[in-house]
C-alpha cells in the first residue's frame, strides 16, 4: 500500500495542474460546493471491497473541512466542506437512488468501480460494471426543466490491490488538503471535536 501512496504523493507534487487528479477533484468540489451551492457529496463504490471507504471519506472530509473559520479566527464568508454520505452502489439503488434521481435537492456524486473483479465470477462482474455505468448516466441526466441537478464523476480502478488502494486513499487525502487551501481553512485541526470532549469531561465531573 505504501508504494501506491508514494506514487500518488509524487503525482500530486509533480504533475501539471491540467493533469493533476487530486487538484482537478478539489477544483470540481470547490465549484460544486461554492458556486453551485451543492450541500452534499455522495460516494458510491460498486465493489464490496471498497464499501468501507464511504465512512472513511466521510470522516476525512467532514472533520477536515467542516469549519467556518480561517486559521486567524475570522469567519469565512460562503460555503466550505460538503456533507459526505453514500453506500454500496448496487444496494443503494433500492434505497436513496430515487431521491438522487427525482428528489427536490441535489448532490455531487462519485461512482467508483474496479475493472477486474476480486472473485471468479467475471460474468456477474460485467453486469455490475454495466449497471454502474448506466446509473452514472441516469443520475446525471435529470430533467433539464427541473431546478435540481447532480454533478456526477466516475472513478475506474483497473484492479484492486494494496498499491491501488493506497493510491486511491492518498488521492482523496490530497484532494482534502487542497480543498483546505481553496476554502481558506486549516484541515488539520478539529476544534468542534475538541469542544465536545471538553464538555463531556465537564459533564462527567458533574455526574461524579
Predicted segments — roles?
Residues 1-208:
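A SIS-like phosphosugar-recognition module
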Amino acid at each position: 500500500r505504501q508504494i501506491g501512496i508514494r506514487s500518488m504523493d509524487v503525482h500530486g507534487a509533480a504533475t501539471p495542474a491540467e493533469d493533476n487528479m487530486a487538484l482537478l477533484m478539489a477544483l470540481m468540489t470547490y465549484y460544486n460546493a461554492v458556486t453551485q451551492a451543492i450541500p452534499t457529496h455522495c460516494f458510491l463504490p460498486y465493489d464490496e471491497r471498497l464499501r468501507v471507504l464511504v465512512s472513511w471519506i466521510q470522516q476525512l472530509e467532514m472533520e477536515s473541512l467542516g469549519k467556518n473559520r480561517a486559521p486567524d479566527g475570522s469567519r469565512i464568508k460562503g460555503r466550505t466542506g460538503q456533507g459526505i454520505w453514500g453506500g454500496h452502489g448496487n444496494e443503494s439503488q433500492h434505497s436513496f437512488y430515487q431521491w438522487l434521481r427525482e428528489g427536490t435537492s441535489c448532490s455531487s456524486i462519485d461512482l467508483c468501480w474496479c475493472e477486474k473483479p476480486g472473485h471468479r465470477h467475471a460474468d456477474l462482474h460485467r453486469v455490475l460494471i454495466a449497471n454502474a455505468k448506466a446509473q452514472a448516466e441516469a443520475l446525471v441526466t435529470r430533467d433539464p426543466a427541473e431546478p435540481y441537478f447532480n454533478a456526477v464523476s466516475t472513478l475506474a480502478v483497473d484492479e484492486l490491490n494494496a498499491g491501488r488502494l493506497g493510491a486511491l486513499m492518498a488521492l482523496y487525502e490530497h484532494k482534502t488538503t487542497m480543498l483546505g487551501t481553496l476554502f481558506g481553512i486549516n484541515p488539520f485541526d478539529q476544534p468542534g471535536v475538541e469542544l465536545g470532549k471538553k464538555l463531556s469531561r465537564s459533564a462527567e465531573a458533574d455526574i461524579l
